Amino acid sequence: MAGMDSGNLKTARLWRDAALRARKLRSNLRQLTLTAAGACPGAGADALESPASPQLVLPANLGDIEALNLGNNGLEEVPEGLGSALGSLRVLVLRRNRFARLPPAVAELGHHLTELDVSHNRLTALGAEVVSALRELRKLNLSHNQLPALPAQLGALAHLEELDVSFNRLAHLPDSLSCLSRLRTLDVDHNQLTAFPRQLLQLVALEELDVSSNRLRGLPEDISALRALKILWLSGAELGTLPAGFCELASLESLMLDNNGLQALPAQFSCLQRLKMLNLSSNLFEEFPAALLPLAGLEELYLSRNQLTSVPSLISGLGRLLTLWLDNNRIRYLPDSIVELTGLEELVLQGNQIAVLPDHFGQLSRVGLWKIKDNPLIQPPYEVCMKGIPYIAAYQKELAHSQPAVQPRLKLLLMGHKAAGKTLLRHCLTEERVEGCPGGGDKEKCYPPSPPPVSKGIEVTSWTADASRGLRFIVYDLAGDESYEVIQPFFLSPGALYVLVVNLATYEPRHFPTTVGSFLHRVGARVPHAVVCIVGTHADLCGERELEEKCLDIHRQIALQEKHDAEGLSRLAKVVDEALARDFELRSASPHAAYYGVSDKNLRRRKAHFQYLLNHRLQILSPVLPVSCRDPRHLRRLRDKLLSVAEHREIFPNLHRVLPRSWQVLEELHFQPPQAQRLWLSWWDSARLGLQAGLTEDRLQSALSYLHESGKLLYFEDSPALKEHVFHNLTRLIDILNVFFQRDPSLLLHKLLLGTSGEGKAEGESSPPMARSTPSQELLRATQLHQYVEGFLLHGLLPAHVIRLLLKPHVQAQQDLQLLLELLEKMGLCYCLNKPKGKPLNGSTAWYKFPCYVQNEVPHAEAWINGTNLAGQSFVAEQLQIEYSFPFTFPLGLFARYSVQINSHVVHRSDGKFQIFAYRGKVPVVVSYRPARGVLQPDTLSIASHASLPNIWTAWQAITPLVEELNVLLQEWPGLHYTVHILCSKCLKRGSPNPHAFPGELLSQPRPEGVAEIICPKNGSERVNVALVYPPTPTVISPCSKKNVGEKHRNQ
């Protein structure tokens, strides 16, 4: 049915209910289902050609059978004696076979047959004699065939009540159709009609009509003759206007007018007082149709993807509204009266320009489906709105209790390669110092030239850029060393200003992809539409001409990269459009077709993503700003630029967000002595601070949740291990992360030796006096620690007690260490290697694995820790392999974090730098990452398993949770373009270097009914079992986002 794939409408239930009614009537009949001997199960019209048509023999004694199902048998003829043997038959199902015409034997059943289903065949004609004989027929399904016309004899079926001729090639309908006076349901969608068939105007009993996806371009004025019509589908009918007579269809209850060219509705539209469901999505409405406001009985209203700029206050008159979709318009504000729609259960507002939600929004407490992303929200803040209506209600309640407060504070991130000059630039900006002060300058802030400061990893500084306006920057200096790449994405967040620092003294055009291009791709993938300023440092080391040429080259190559990416995405979007223009049946007919077998719903999702990527390109400020830290004019110009951009309300609306004063006070109290020095606070400690801020316990939760979402502190209400603690000291946490990601063996060994010198003297511990160690003991201890450092840098392995030594003095008590390790595991940075799930370690040493440190490319058995070994993989019949491809950029640290995320799903694992061998139960799985090899071979990440064909469900069961975990992680990169494919099992078995790739969207679709095998396009003689392409049950393509720790402290 038209629109069934949209997933946005509940109207599918209308057709489902009709099917259930028919099934209920059939349930009292004596039924029989037959399968042809030797036939491939489900070898229907869409299946492969078989050498011989399967034969089906009727059993004896069929005289009492009233319902016979011969569907999914690949039949070209019905069995001999069908008509004479079935004297009582009332229902005959022949769907999904290979009939080119209605079998003559069907005519013999005409005097008692009431229901006939010949859908999904190859009918090009019906046969006048056969149709004439079906005089008792009440229900006829001819959908999904190749019929160019219908015979006139169809009009003689006086008892016909339901007729489905959708998905055919009908250019017109026979005049005799007007004689079907009892017809209640007619489906003609997806045909080739060029005008509304006037014959239908005579069908006074018609209640349900679908003429979607035909090029009608208009409706007749006298369509009002269809007075019994209750359900009308006109989706994608190329309608520009509705005639006044349309408004006389007074019985209409459900109306689908989506995907047309409507700009307005007739004033008389308000006469449709029985209307309960209306879909006007994907039209050209610039104003909310006033004619809808008097429709007091309306329950569902869809106005997605129009050009609306406002919603009228009189919408509150739609008091029975349960569903309201207004997404992807240009709405700037909502009327206060919208909160009176207290019965709303679905409210979709994403993709608009809404900055402020009305007061008392929490009254919409019944809303379950809530979408608000991609709006410039200020009040409530974006982080609050994304949590849902209860959190919005708590925010507004708190705002009413305490005076509002505005905090102009912007996150500024300095990015760039190692030695780009980020740290020196940060010092000069935040301390307002000038190195050397050539040509004058403020002597009080003038410092003699000094060696470039050495970065200590990721550093955070607060910078009051303009005290008079109270404007502050929180400056994050992101380390340029590759070892920090796994944690850098945690700090890339919406609402921040990105400064990409390039060393102009060493820059060469051929190095653009690594010094500039890759950083832009990275930020764009993580934070679509981010604001980026390019700053060139060491300008004093370049000649005037050289400086100009290098800045112009960076500017030119950025423009070329953006143009290349946008054109590539446009081409891909065009392929999706072309696929959507073809019928699903046509797409599914040939594996050679683009997006073979992909549903309209998945194609529309794909198209929407491409459109999102095209509409949310990076905002790159031009031109490149050359800076020398020795020139106060350069620094002043850079400061002025940053301030002018920061104060632009349309670019950074969050800078002006309004908070309850009590929430701001709670934040400030967390950072005052004595608690400011502690690594974490208990929930009760925070509750006591909340009372000082005027927050009762029931109001504290929302405040902590906001501070967590906005990156001020970490509070994991969804984690049993962490929910009783609040991590407020983010500076110390970053210092701890820096310890793990400085890959200097001498520095690590020095920290361990310092840690051992104070061992046994930690706070809260007591120990007897220790004798001074002998030189030989000191040497032995140093040797052991050196081995631990080597194991860490080569294999990413550290025992818990060594981690404690490494983190002194940051971690003192054992509880600090345990909480910190739980936190690192939640961030996806490490996992406990030998801890039984849900059980204590019974005194044995806990070992932790940091996958980003693994150096050996091929996994090896770690039997020296867990006593297991990975047996060699034996030959098996069939392979499953899901491959993710990343054409533009591969997310930083994704493989390492994914390695941690899957740990709870696998056992007996062995890790390499780019590969993981493991088991799901007794089923082997292999996760592999292959870095890009040039422009034409992108980065890929694959998940594979294998099993014999009868047991292939076990392989699907093994890899499906791993696929879903990867999908969850990729949700953190909304601007990332990637593709998913199922690799052909036959190609893999042959060892093909370039196996055929079936579309990954098939993973989220049910197996096609009646299809047993699929042709591999790489080799037309190869047939792939459908079980090797489609999972037993569809996977979750867009799983609900899990709480990610890394997401939270990146949002400050």
Curated annotation (Swiss-Prot):
Subcellular localization: Cytoplasm
Residues with site note (Breakpoint for translocation to form chimeric MASL1): G1000, E1001
Main location: cytoplasm
Coiled-coil features, chain-numbered ranges: none
Positions bearing N-acetylalanine: A2
Molecular function as annotated in GO: GTP binding; protein phosphatase 2A binding; ubiquitin protein ligase binding
Domain (Roc) ranges: 403-649
Tissues in which the UniProt entry reports expression: Ubiquitously expressed. Overexpressed in malignant fibrous histiocytomas. Expressed in red blood cells (at protein level).
Stimuli inducing this protein: Up-regulated during erythroid cells differentiation (at protein level). Up-regulated upon Toll-like receptor TLR2 stimulation. Up-regulated in macrophages upon M. tuberculosis infection. Up-regulated upon sepsis. Up-regulated by glucose.
GO biological process: erythrocyte differentiation; inflammatory response; innate immune response; intracellular signal transduction; negative regulation of inflammatory response; negative regulation of protein localization to nucleus; negative regulation of toll-like receptor 2 signaling pathway; negative regulation of toll-like receptor 4 signaling pathway
SUPFAM superfamilies tied to this protein: L domain-like, P-loop containing nucleoside triphosphate hydrolases, Polo-box domain
Lineage: superkingdom: Eukaryota
Example of a GO cellular component annotation carried by this entry: cytoplasm
Region entry Required for interaction with PPP2R2A, spans: 64-649
Region (Required for interaction with PJA2): 64-364
N6-acetyllysine PTM sites in chain numbering: K601
LRR repeats: 64-85, 88-109, 112-133, 136-157, 159-180, 182-203, 205-226, 228-249, 251-272, 274-296, 297-318, 320-341, 343-364
PTM notes: Ubiquitinated. Ubiquitination by PJA2 does not lead MFHAS1 to proteasomal degradation but positively regulates its function in polarization of macrophages.
PROSITE patterns linked to this entry: LRR, ROC
UniProt cross-references to InterPro entries, sorted A to Z: Leu-rich_rpt, Leu-rich_rpt_typical-subtyp, LRR_dom_sf, LRR_domain-containing, P-loop_NTPase, ROC
Alphabetical keyword list: Acetylation, Chromosomal rearrangement, Cytoplasm, GTP-binding, Immunity, Inflammatory response, Innate immunity, Leucine-rich repeat, Nucleotide-binding, Repeat, Signal transduction inhibitor, Tumor suppressor, Ubl conjugation
PANTHER family listed in its UniProt record: PTHR48051, RAS SUPPRESSOR PROTEIN 1
General function of this protein: Probable GTP-binding protein. Functions in innate immunity and more specifically the inflammatory response as a regulator of the Toll-like receptor TLR2 and TLR4 signaling pathways. Negatively regulates the part of the TLR4 signaling pathway that leads to the activation of the transcription factor AP-1. By retaining the phosphatase complex PP2A into the cytoplasm, prevents the dephosphorylation of the AP-1 subunit JUN which is required for proper activation of the transcription factor. Both inhibits and activates the TLR2-dependent signaling pathway.
Disease: A chromosomal aberration involving MFHAS1 may be a cause of B-cell lymphoma. Translocation t(8;14)(p23.1;q21) with a cryptic exon named '14q21 element'. The resulting fusion protein named 'chimeric MASL1' is tumorigenic in nude mice.
Quaternary organization: Interacts with RAF1. Interacts with HSPD1. Interacts with PPP2CA; retains PPP2CA into the cytoplasm and excludes it from the nucleus. Interacts with PPP2R2A; the interaction is direct. Interacts with PJA2.
Name assigned to this protein: Malignant fibrous histiocytoma-amplified sequence 1
Gene that this sequence comes from: MFHAS1
